[in-house]
């Protein structure tokens, strides 16, 4: 039996909260002073218009740049204060969906060689200096990123490297809090916490049981297995899965991965069991989980077989249900793309600031900027027919249209697909037949030109008015 992954439903225009400007993403920000709030609005727009450039280049002018540096250095300004209004805006988008996947992951930010930055910690080797970033990204099953729900950064001494599993447990606790908040506010959205192998922690499984025992609602979870755990029925998870009947096959396109892994088509067989796990330490309850084995039986010659074991609290009995959970897990790739945009597009590892606290404040701005690029990319792919004014300001899309088409813009906003392709063409996208939708790199480069186009069109209008 061969069965492709379930087709996703395409959301309609009413599904989305408009995200016209980066400044609106931090609407309601409270940095303790109206002038600081105003500076934050200006700064995120300036950085967002030139995300690949240094802060002085993006801001422009010594006085403006000094004001930006002063904001990042101010003790009343903190990363969570900057991100909080974006979290709130993201929550409003989350409420409009029946299922939202909350993917978490940790990435290193390497500042080795920048010894003048005060407060850096060690990374995986004692001579590597930097900090860690652990965001929670809200993603729909259609792979559209709705925004950040949480984000933490930290530094550590080398000897504390093994103590960071607590970040994953705390992350799940935070997702449960958001699920409870949604319930309190009358929203029926189902949240599914998602993590890769680093999140395979029995404490997370037990945490959900304890929350439910208190009579509170808890978030569901879907985690890739790292440990071949003991079960209460005897034997380990893997051996029991291999004995389970095959539900069928699925076929999907695997994106390019780390190292030299190429993008390719993958066909996997699916097996599933429901099994009680033996607690990993005293004091933890027995937790019954669903385990799904997705195994590539016949990989291409020279390629390693793609296989995963996924664990979840959700019931999975049919091929359709197992396929859905695997499709959800593949959505986790969006957080990897987010990290790529943050590092390669926003170049956050090149920040030249005096203290790690200022780095963290700058990271808060750049995370929102990186999310918007990811949102544009995936929204354009999944919903190309939506009007572009959902995500572009009027002067933005009109300026891009004028410069590209050399004609007056239409009264009705063009589609997202048309405008994003125009933007990406200024980032190297050739828009040839069969090229598909632009990727995030060409979009973030093209977005940097949009600001210049807007300024040029506005300057031309001023000159015309003066002549009249």
Language model features with spans:
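Single, function-defining residue in the core of a domain
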Residues: 2-117, 125-132, 137-468
């Amino acid at each position: 039996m061969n069965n492709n992954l379930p087709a996703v439903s395409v959301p309609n225009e009413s599904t989305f909260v408009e995200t016209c400007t980066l400044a609106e993403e931090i609407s309601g920000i409270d940095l303790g002073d109206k002038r600081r709030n105003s500076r934050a609005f200006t700064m995120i727009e300036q950085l967002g218009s030139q995300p690949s450039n240094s802060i002085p280049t993006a801001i422009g002018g010594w006085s403006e740049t000094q004001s930006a540096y002063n904001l990042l250095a101010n003790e009343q300004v903190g990363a969570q204060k900057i991100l909080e209004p974006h979290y709130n805006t993201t929550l409003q988008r989350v409420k409009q969906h029946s299922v939202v996947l909350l993917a978490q992951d940790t990435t290193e930010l390497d500042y080795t060689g920048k010894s003048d930055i005060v407060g850096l910690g060690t990374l995986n080797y004692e001579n590597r200096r930097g900090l860690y970033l652990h965001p929670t990204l809200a993603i729909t099953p259609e792979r559209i990123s709705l925004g950040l729900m949480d984000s933490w950064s930290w530094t550590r001494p080398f000897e504390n490297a093994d103590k960071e599993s607590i970040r994953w447990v705390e992350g799940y606790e935070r997702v449960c809090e958001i699920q409870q908040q949604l319930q309190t506010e009358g929203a029926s959205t189902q949240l599914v916490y998602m993590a890769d192998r680093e999140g395979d922690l029995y404490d997370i499984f037990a945490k959900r049981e304890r929350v439910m025992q208190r009579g509170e609602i808890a978030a569901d979870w879907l985690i890739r297995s790292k440990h071949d755990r003991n079960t209460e029925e005897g034997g380990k998870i893997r051996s029991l899965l291999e004995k389970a009947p095959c539900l069928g096959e699925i076929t999907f396109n695997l994106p390019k991965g780390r190292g030299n892994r190429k993008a390719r088509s993958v066909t996997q067989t699916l097996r599933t069991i429901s099994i009680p796990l033996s607690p990993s330490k005293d004091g933890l309850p027995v937790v019954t989980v669903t385990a799904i084995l997705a195994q590539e039986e016949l990989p291409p010659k020279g390629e390693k077989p793609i296989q995963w074991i996924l664990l979840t609290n959700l019931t999975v009995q049919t091929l359709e249900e197992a396929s859905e959970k695997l499709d959800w897990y593949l959505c986790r790739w969006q957080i990897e793309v987010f990290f790529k945009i943050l590092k390669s597009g926003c170049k956050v590892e090149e920040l030249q600031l005096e203290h790690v606290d200022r780095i963290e404040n700058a990271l808060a701005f750049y995370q929102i900027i990186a999310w918007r690029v990811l949102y544009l990319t995936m929204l354009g792919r999944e919903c190309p027919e939506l009007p572009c004014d959902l995500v572009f300001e009027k002067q933005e899309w009109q300026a891009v249209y004028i410069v590209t088409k050399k004609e007056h813009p239409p009264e009705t906003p063009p589609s997202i697909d048309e405008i994003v392709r125009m933007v990406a063409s200024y980032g190297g996208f050739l828009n040839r037949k069969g090229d598909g939708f632009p990727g995030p790199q060409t979009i973030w480069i093209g977005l940097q030109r949009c600001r210049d186009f807007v300024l040029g069109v506005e300057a031309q209008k001023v000159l015309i008015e003066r002549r009249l």
